Curated annotation (Swiss-Prot):
Residues 51-65, 899-913 have a biased composition (Basic and acidic residues). One of its GO terms (cellular component) is extracellular matrix. Glycans are attached at K87, K914. It comes from Glyptodon sp. (strain SLP-2019). The modification 5-hydroxylysine is found at K87, K239, K314, K559, K670, K840, K902, K914. Residues 26-39, 101-115, 122-140, 188-238, 347-401, 443-470, 513-535, 592-606, 619-646, 675-691, 720-729, 741-762, 815-830, 884-898, 932-965 have a biased composition (Low complexity). Residues 1-998 are annotated as: Disordered. The modification 4-hydroxyproline is found at residues 18, 21, 24, 33, 48, 63, 69, 78, 84, 116, 122, 143, 152, 155, 182, 185, 197, 203, 212, 218, 221, 236, 245, 248, 260, 269, 284, 290, 299, 305, 323, 332, 338, 344, 353, 356, 365, 374, 380, 392, 401, 410, 413, 431, 449, 455, 461, 467, 473, 479, 491, 500, 511, 523, 526, 532, 538, 547, 565, 580, 607, 613, 616, 625, 631, 649, 658, 667, 679, 685, 694, 703, 706, 727, 736, 744, 753, 771, 780, 783, 789, 804, 810, 816, 825, 831, 851, 854, 857, 929, 932, 950, 965, 971, 986, 989, 992, 995, 998. GO terms for biological process: extracellular matrix organization. This is Collagen alpha-1(I) chain. Expressed in bones. The modification Phosphoserine is found at S93, S595.
Length: 998
């Protein structure tokens, strides 16, 4: 054979086309959740959130138990006298009270008898005046001796009305007689037969005017009559002093947020008071409501995309990855629904306003914490038990006083009671002539308070009264004692954890070094998925540096490197509060660092010793008003003010509804008798009054003339015994019986409640006094002991799974992976088609010619089947970290992270030195006129004035209204039972009774 000569190497073939992408490998198992990272430092507070919508009104809470009585409230200013009310309807007659036992006998001593004056001729009777308001029932005086009854005279003829005689001069006042011992009641005399009515006499001639008689000496004090029925309640007096504040009731559940009241007009600034002594350190207040969440920073800048790697062949299925680090603690879920509001507690009595406390010091700002890198979300944990209740929040500042509400509509009338049985009506006698006004007896012993009377019928609703003038603000009271520390409240339920959001593209491998921040570049194409990076070790938390003085807020600069931790320094004195600086620009959010494992909770250190007071600082600006302090101690009662001049009578106000019947107070001491004033001039006739409400039933008129004698009828059948008649009208008191006055007995039982009487006319309004000067600000109280820190409650249970979170930002493009090993050559392809024959060449020389040039390559054959996947190449060493890419555009804000735990309360700062006294403010506008002062004690009786000349006869006034019925006399003898009357028509059906017991 011939020697085979190797020909020259042919040109390299064209590069093969890349094979199809391999199918994705099976998904790896999710690793167990890693341990929670350490809690980052507390970030700065976020901006205040907007007010949420008003919640629904809570159900009324249960009435709170009445607490111990609070300290005595300061004496309130006397209220403004109300407008005179219209005369109310006549109340029902009260039941007669039980007769009290006679009191002990006083010393019997006769006073000198005055000289009797000449008896003047009686003048003509004037028109009956309208009945005044009944005053409080006076103490019953001892009964005096009653003169013997004269023989009954025959009814004379009605004389003509004589002219009014001149007024007699008042006699000199005799010495007051000694109170005599009450005599025993005499036996009741037998009722005499009723006399025939006399015939009407002829009208008598007009009598001449009599000469003025000399006023007689005052007689002995009359016998003490029986206690009259309780008179109608007088007009409501001025508002009394505020009572002692009641103990605060148990705090009910928080009700629904009410609508904000209208903002009051800001008053003029008051003068700056002296800085008070440093107040006691208050107990640590309860944990306040969490502030609104701060804005979450945008995602970090996106790096440059890596170069596109060459798609290698499909690798074998990957091994199960190692469990990833524990995800951070899930964010708290939504707050639980508020519980139903409890019934409102009993309203406590109004206490005196406390003085505002001293302004607190502003602590130095803490170092800003760095945000930890959020880990993958862990599975939702089991729901924990409810924590203990947290401390109640601090008392907020007093809000603006709301407007006075409009007067409510009167309630519906009560159910009609069962109809009572009607007794026989007793005959009402004609009213007797008015006797001379007796002197007021000495004060008797105070009787036991009677039962409350039955409520009178509701009067027509009165018109709304005019708003009263605002009173003068009172002086600031002394600061109250520091309140007790409240209990720590239960922590709220843990919110529901939301499901983890869809996983973003896998991130970079090993973390690179932070380079200088460049300008934002255009986003590149997404790179291929790189290998997972190793989690770095968490760094140690540096100690907080010394807080410097608070300066003006500057523009936010770039974030610098963390400094070396310094030692804890001594807390400096709080400097003066500077003026607010301009708001700085918001800085870019830094890169999120890796989260380290949670460290053990350190033990709480012991409180440090109290430092020495520092040098005095300059006076700070006036702080906001402090919270309402505890009511101060009751001050000593002030001296009674002088009685002001009587003001003009106010216009008559509308009739108000009858108020509740108050207990009858003890009668006051007898005042000295005043001197008689000169007779007044005849007044002008008054204007026609408004038509008042229907008056009470008038008294029975005098008996009419006797009618003709009727024929004697036949004796009818005896009727059935009728119902017991009502007690008859009280007859006139009988003459006193013989015997000595007995000693007074013990107080009798309390009488039955009286009925409400008509509302009396209010007195004239006094002159409004000038507002007093505003008192200086009181010193704050001494600091109290600091309370013990509360114990941390158990962690709450994990909430239910929440809705899926938003899609996270795309991860950074990883570096290109290494090219895989070259695959094994594929199978040989089928031979290609034969080429077309070439042009016929020249005939060659005889013999073997030189080897011809290689022919052109044939057309590529069809693609052969895909070769088998080669073995997965080993991971090569990590290349050096490339330079940091420029910062990408800021992404959308991510979801809010969980709120950090509240740090421990810092140590108490040193006590500040008393600042300089501020300058007095401008004098405010004059306050509204104050309420009239209380009526002073009655002055001593002055000497009797000289006798004045007789006044001229006045013009007769208009006919007055029917007078009110007189007091009920002592009970008369019981009348005989009358014959049974005809059966009346059936009454209306009564209201249905209450349901019986089950």
């Amino acid at each position: 054979g011939g020697v085979s000569v190797p020909g020259p190497m042919g040109p390299s073939g064209p590069r093969g086309l890349p094979g199809p992408p391999g199918s994705p490998g099976p998904q790896g198992f999710q690793g167990p959740p890693g341990s929670s990272g350490p809690m980052g430092p507390r970030g700065p507070p976020g901006p205040p959130g907007k007010n949420g919508d008003d919640g629904e009104a809570g159900k009324p809470g249960r009435p709170g138990e009445r607490g111990p009585p609070g300290p005595q409230g300061a004496r309130g200013l006397p209220g403004t006298a109300g407008l005179p009310g219209m005369k109310g309807h006549r109340g029902f007659s009260g039941l007669d009270g039980a007769k009290g036992d006679a009191g002990p006998a006083g010393p019997k001593q006769m006073g000198p008898r005055g000289l009797p004056g000449e008896r003047g001729r009686p003048g003509a009777s004037g028109p009956a005046g309208a009945r005044g308001n009944d005053g409080a029932t006076g103490a019953a005086g001892p009964p005096g001796p009653t003169g013997p009854a004269g023989p009954p005279g025959f009814p004379g003829a009605v004389g003509a009305k004589g002219e009014a005689g001149p007024q007699g001069a008042r006699g000199s006042e005799g010495p007051q007689g000694v109170r005599g011992e009450p005599g025993p009641p005499g036996p009741a005399g037998a009722a005499g037969p009723a006399g025939n009515p006399g015939a009407d006499g002829q009208p008598g001639a007009k009598g001449a005017n009599g000469a003025p008689g000399i006023a007689g000496a005052p007689g002995f004090p009359g016998a003490r009559g029986p206690s009259g029925p309780q008179g109608p309640s007088g007009a409501p007096g001025p508002k009394g002093n505020s009572g002692e504040p009641g103990a605060p009731g148990n705090k009910g559940d928080t009700g629904a947020k009410g609508e904000p009241g209208p903002t009051g007009i800001q008053g003029p600034p008051g003068p700056a008071g002296e800085e008070g002594k440093r107040g006691a350190r208050g107990e640590p207040g309860p944990t306040g409501l969490p502030g609104p969440p701060g804005e979450r920073g945008g995602p970090g800048s996106r790096g440059f995309p890596g170069a596109d790697g060459i798609a290698g062949p499909k690798g074998p299925a990957g091994e199960r990855g190692s469990p990833g680090p524990a995800g951070p603690k899930g964010s708290p879920g939504e707050a639980g629904r508020p519980g139903e509001a409890g019934l409102p507690g009993a309203k406590g009595l109004t206490g005196s306003p406390g003085s505002p406390g001293p302004d607190g010091k502003t602590g130095p700002p803490g170092p800003a914490g760095q945000d930890g890198r959020p880990g993958p979300a862990g599975p939702p944990g089991a729901r924990g038990q409810a924590g203990v209740m947290g401390f109640p929040g601090p008392k907020g500042a007093a809000g603006e006083p709301g407007k006075a509400g409009e007067r409510g509509v009167p309630g519906p009338p009560g159910a009609v009671g069962p109809a009572g049985k009607d007794g026989e009506a007793g005959a009402q006698g004609p009213p007797g002539p008015a006797g001379p006004a007796g002197e007021r007896g000495e004060q008797g012993p105070a009787g036991s308070p009677g039962f409350q009377g039955l409520p009178g019928p509701a009067g027509p609703p009165g018109e709304a009264g005019k708003p009263g003038e605002q009173g003068v603000p009172g002086d600031l009271g002394a600061p109250g004692p520091s309140g007790a520390r409240g209990e720590r409240g239960f922590p709220g339920e843990r919110g529901v954890q939301g499901p983890p959001g869809p996983a973003g593209p896998r991130g970079n491998g090993a973390p690179g070094n932070d380079g200088a921040k460049g300008d934002a570049g255009a986003p590149g194409a997404p790179g291929s998925q790189g290998a997972p990076g190793l989690q770095g070790m968490p760094g140690e938390r540096g100690a907080a540096g010394l807080p410097g003085p608070k300066g003006d807020r500057g523009d936010a600069g770039p974030k610098g490197a963390d400094g070396a931790p310094g030692k804890d320094g001594v807390r400096g004195l709080t400097g003066p509060i500077g003026p607010p600086g301009p708001a700085g620009a918001a800085g870019d959010k830094g890169e999120t660092g890796p989260s380290g494992p949670a460290g053990p909770t350190g033990a709480r250190g012991a409180p440090g010793d109290r430092g020495e007071p520092g040098p005095p600082g300059p006076a700070g600006f006036a702080g906001p008003p402090g919270a309402d302090g505890q009511p101060g101690a009751k001050g000593e009662p002030g001296d009674a003010g002088a009685k002001g001049d009587a003001g003009p009578p106010g216009p008559a106000g509308p009739t108000g509804p009858p108020g509740p019947i108050g207990n009858v107070g003890a009668p006051g001491p007898k005042g000295a008798r005043g001197s008689a004033g000169p007779p007044g001039a005849t007044g002008f006739p008054g204007a026609a009054g408004r038509v008042g409400p229907p008056g009470p039933s008038g008294n029975a008129g005098p008996p009419g003339p006797p009618g003709p004698v009727g024929k004697e009828g036949g004796k009818g059948p005896r009727g059935e015994t009728g119902p017991a008649g009502r007690p008859g009208e009280v007859g006139p008191p009988g003459p006193p019986g013989p015997g000595e006055k007995g000693s007074p007995g013990a107080d009798g039982p309390a009488g039955a409640p009286g009925t409400p009487g008509p509302q009396g006319i209010a007195g004239q309004r006094g002159v409004v006094g000038l507002p007093g000067q505003r008192g200086e600000r009181g010193f704050p109280g001494l600091p109290g002991p600091s309370g013990e820190p509360g114990k941390q409650g158990p962690s709450g249970s994990s909430g239910e799974r929440g809705p899926p979170g938003p899609m996270g930002p795309p991860g950074l493009a990883g570096p290109p992976g290494e090219a895989g090993r070259e695959g094994s050559p594929g199978a040989e392809g089928s031979p290609g088609r034969d080429g077309s024959p070439g042009p016929k060449g020249d005939r060659g020389e005889t013999g073997p010619g030189p080897p011809g040039a290689p022919g052109a390559p044939g057309a590529p054959g069809p693609v052969g089947p895909a070769g088998k996947s080669g073995d997965r190449g080993e991971t090569g060493p990590s290349g050096p970290a490339g330079p940091a890419g420029p910062a990408g555009a800021r992404g959308p804000a991510g979801p809010q992270g969980p709120r950090g735990d509240k740090g421990e309360t810092g140590e108490q700062g040193d006590r500040g030195i008393k600042g300089h006294r501020g300058f007095s403010g401008l004098q405010g506008p004059a306050g509204p006129p104050g309420s009239p002062g209380e009526q002073g004690p009655s002055g001593a009786s002055g000497p009797a004035g000289p006798r004045g000349p007789p006044g001229s006869a006045g013009t007769p006034g208009k006919d007055g209204l029917n007078g009110l019925p007189g007091p009920i006399g002592p009970p008369g003898p019981r009348g005989r039972t009358g014959d049974a009357g005809p059966v009346g028509p059936p009454g209306p059906p009564g209201p249905p009774g209450p349901p019986g017991p089950p």
